[in-house]
């Protein structure tokens, strides 16, 4: 089967898109993917069974709302035209579209008229995301407009997927789509993220010369509330002089600069190290060298209702115990015996949790094992089968 796919992201950097494309290739399907083009990338490229068609646009992080609107609109127009051209050549059975933005699903108008079924993959819930980023009211014109686009997009799609049950339930409060929406989680890829026994030897409280390593990877964004995390780290160092933190990833340039300035002003540059983003294949080895995963979030309407950080799931899959901001979505999957929660605005509580886990290696081991068991029903092989079933049902219907 040949499948068309559209995403406003880079390939293969978007992990969810990459995993789905590779899953399709594994069963012999061919994918024509339309996406963004970064500097130095080829306009067209074949990666396995994935034909990548990159449009001459880049994503600019940290821009204002008007900048995002202009970027999304430009991508929509180019993707609409590119997908139409590809459709006349291949006549797809299914076309899958990933949000953001929601209205990107309408790039499939031509293939849908010609008989293709449309699968909309909702990575995020846009109205609440804009509330989180821009502080808009749920009674504002902008919020209502975003809800309108969401409702129109979900009504237009033949089937809908989303990333966790909390975001699904929120969609259902304002969209009558229970008959066509399913959850396919961002479960870690077991080819890379697999528990194989203890990684770094857990340092005891008596071995002060051995570093106790905290680890974080992924985007560095304001809504992840690194200020509290760094303050908590600084407090914990009073009890753990050997404490270290490695942060891998990129993010909003202005915010990243603020975070690095805070580290420099507190003379922590030797203890908190920033690294460039690395390919997903390299992340597991870095996790194995860590003693504790760090997952900070700022609790707001978006994060608390729908956000389940993929990095946390990757730490769980690798058997790395984690400290995480207490947010509703994470608590709906894990309890306090599986993840060490702290109030999102309490560096004191974070520091207390870090010190407690440092002093109790057996507690870290028990927490990691319980988290692995808790997430077993959501592992990728199960999600992959669900993804295949959705596509097969679309073809048969």
Positions of the model-derived regions?
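Conserved donor-binding/catalytic core segment of Leloir-type glycosyltransferases
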Residues: 206-233, 246
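Conserved acidic donor-binding segment of nucleotide-sugar-dependent glycosyltransferases
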Residues: 336-347, 356-362
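Membrane-proximal helix-turn-helix segments that form the acceptor-binding/catalytic region
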Residues: 84, 103-114, 120, 126, ...
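Acidic anion/phosphate-binding donor-loop and adjacent secondary structure
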Residues: 172-173, 178, 188-205, 210, ...
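Nucleotide-activated donor-binding/catalytic signature segment of Leloir-type glycosyltransferases, i.e.
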Residues: 257-284
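Carbohydrate-associated surface elements
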Residues: 166, 187
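A short, well-ordered alpha-helix in the C-terminal region of glycosyltransferases
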Residues: 349, 356, 363-377, 389
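Nucleotide-sugar-dependent
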Residues: 224, 281-286, 293-313, 324-332
